């Protein structure tokens, strides 16, 4: 075990992004006694939860010269986890007063944004944020001393470029901006329209069209039903489905689930692995996103390879730069806000010297062992950061490092019950449930923070 930093030492820390991860990072860093500056490109807090009707000029979002739109939120989006599970651990996502608030248990994106603004107001986060300021480069500043970082940023309105030195950098820029695309044989000569779900907002452009959605994520599930209200036909293709899959969705006359696309052709047809051939107008990729840190220059030490960000100890610290560079929010298939909170507490405590880290050598050994385990299990590199059922073990490990209580039993049970309900009743799980006893347990805990 490497020695901790000087006890209760305060550092000048830059946080990149004022979304859900950046907000709680700023709070925890300041609580630990650090001096914090948050860089945010947009005019307000909220990150990807800030809805906009704007979409990118390139519907596939591959043109490097395009004007990037940060949000991937579509107009009809409602959260797919319960309100109780979604919120930060010590700032519950409860129904608040206000005529414009969404009181549903699975509220809209607008309610999540309002919650994040409530959080920022409650803890005075905005006073730490430089809005409309884009970080263009983050790089080690070795000439300034061990662990120092140079941040180059530009302010949109003032057109001011700053070059500043920080002791540490916490990266919280989200990962719902740079789309991943499916590889489809014949796509270069297919005459129809392609797009990524990042640029989906409303169903109207799909009226009377035949659309194919690729993917099995929550977004594919929700958007396919949204579009089916106006489209002629909607076909959902997924590579994880058996090759003979062809299922008409209950309650719809125009929505089908297929196996993956085998090929597309110049006549506009799409051929599936199940043998079906359909003439299609639009293909939408609901295929997720790439981790993307265009501002980060580490001379190749921290890389993104097939969507593996590495090397990272516990998905947070790159050993070569620990603890002066860290990442929040890399794992997926998790309850994000509670995880962000625990990661933030850990980072803040490590930086202050209160919590020790292993040596760089020991961190690298653990990372390599983890990578080897994934390889032996046949798990693709792109799933390195997928947690799913292991998320609570991870959260509890973080909690043990920080001296916090473990994940509440009600939160674990509620999350698992919601997953079962969602799979069995994708149409109604947001509005019909039977876990009232867990809701009562949650609100008993929430009373501690009211």
From Swiss-Prot:
<dbReference type="InterPro" id="IPR020946">
    <property type="entry name" value="Flavin_mOase-like"/>
</dbReference>
<comment type="function">
    <text>Catalyzes the conversion of methylthioalkyl glucosinolates of any chain length into methylsulfinylalkyl glucosinolates.</text>
</comment>
<keyword id="KW-0560">Oxidoreductase</keyword>
<dbReference type="GO" id="GO:0004499">
    <property type="term" value="F:N,N-dimethylaniline monooxygenase activity"/>
</dbReference>
<dbReference type="Pfam" id="PF00743">
    <property type="entry name" value="FMO-like"/>
</dbReference>
<keyword id="KW-0503">Monooxygenase</keyword>
<dbReference type="InterPro" id="IPR050346">
    <property type="entry name" value="FMO-like"/>
</dbReference>
<feature type="binding site">
    <location>
        <begin position="17"/>
        <end position="22"/>
    </location>
    <ligand>
        <name>FAD</name>
    </ligand>
</feature>
<dbReference type="InterPro" id="IPR036188">
    <property type="entry name" value="FAD/NAD-bd_sf"/>
</dbReference>
<dbReference type="GO" id="GO:0050661">
    <property type="term" value="F:NADP binding"/>
</dbReference>
<protein>
    <recommendedName>
        <fullName>Flavin-containing monooxygenase FMO GS-OX-like 5</fullName>
        <ecNumber>1.8.-.-</ecNumber>
    </recommendedName>
</protein>
<keyword id="KW-0521">NADP</keyword>
<dbReference type="GO" id="GO:0050660">
    <property type="term" value="F:flavin adenine dinucleotide binding"/>
</dbReference>
<keyword id="KW-0274">FAD</keyword>
<dbReference type="InterPro" id="IPR000960">
    <property type="entry name" value="Flavin_mOase"/>
</dbReference>
<feature type="binding site">
    <location>
        <begin position="215"/>
        <end position="220"/>
    </location>
    <ligand>
        <name>NADP(+)</name>
    </ligand>
</feature>
<comment type="similarity">
    <text>Belongs to the FMO family.</text>
</comment>
<keyword id="KW-0285">Flavoprotein</keyword>
């Amino acid at each position: 075990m490497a020695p901790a930093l000087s006890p209760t030492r305060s550092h000048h820390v830059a946080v990149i992004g004022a979304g859900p991860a950046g907000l709680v990072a700023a709070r925890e860093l300041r609580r630990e006694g650090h001096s914090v500056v948050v860089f945010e490109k947009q005019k307000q807090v909220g990150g990807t939860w800030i809805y906009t009707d704007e979409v990118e000029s390139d519907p596939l979002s591959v043109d490097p010269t395009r004007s990037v739109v940060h949000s991937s939120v579509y107009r009809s989006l409602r959260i797919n986890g319960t309100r109780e599970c979604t919120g930060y651990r010590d700032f519950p996502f409860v129904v608040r007063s206000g005529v414009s608030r969404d009181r549903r248990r699975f509220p809209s994106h607008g309610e999540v944004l309002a919650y994040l603004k409530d959080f920022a107001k409650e803890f005075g986060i905005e006073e730490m944020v430089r809005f409309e300021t884009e970080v263009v480069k983050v790089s080690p500043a070795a000439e300034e001393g061990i662990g120092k970082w140079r941040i180059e940023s530009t302010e949109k309105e003032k057109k001011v470029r700053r070059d500043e030195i920080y002791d540490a950098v916490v990266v919280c820029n989200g990962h719902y901006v740079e789309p991943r695309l499916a590889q489809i044989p014949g796509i270069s000569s297919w005459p129809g329209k392609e797009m990524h779900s990042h640029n989906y907002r409303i169903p109207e452009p799909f009226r009377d069209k035949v659309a194919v959605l690729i993917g099995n994520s929550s977004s594919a599930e929700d958007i396919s039903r949204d579009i089916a209200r106006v489209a002629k036909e909607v076909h959902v293709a997924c590579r994880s489905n058996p090759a003979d899959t062809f299922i008409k969705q209950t309650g719809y006359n125009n929505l089908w689930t297929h196996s993956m696309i085998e090929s597309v052709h110049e006549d506009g047809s799409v051929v599936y692995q199940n043998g079906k051939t359909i003439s299609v107008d639009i293909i939408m990729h609901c295929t997720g996103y790439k981790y993307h840190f265009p501002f980060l220059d580490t001379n190749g030490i921290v890389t993104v390879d097939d969507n593996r960000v590495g090397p990272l100890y516990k998905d947070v610290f790159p050993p070569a730069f620990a603890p002066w560079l860290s990442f929040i929010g890399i794992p997926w298939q998790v309850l994000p806000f509670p995880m962000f909170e625990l990661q933030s507490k850990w980072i803040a405590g490590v930086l202050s010297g209160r919590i020790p880290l292993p040596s760089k050598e020991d961190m690298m050994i653990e990372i390599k062992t983890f990578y080897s385990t994934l390889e032996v299990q046949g798990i693709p590199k792109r799933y390195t950061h997928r947690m799913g059922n292991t998320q609570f073990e991870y959260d509890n490990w973080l909690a043990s490092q920080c001296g916090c209580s473990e994940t509440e039993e009600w939160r674990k049970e509620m999350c698992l019950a919601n997953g079962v309900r969602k799979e069995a009743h994708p149409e109604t799980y947001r509005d019909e449930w039977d876990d009232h006893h867990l809701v009562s347990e949650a609100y008993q805990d929430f009373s501690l923070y009211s």
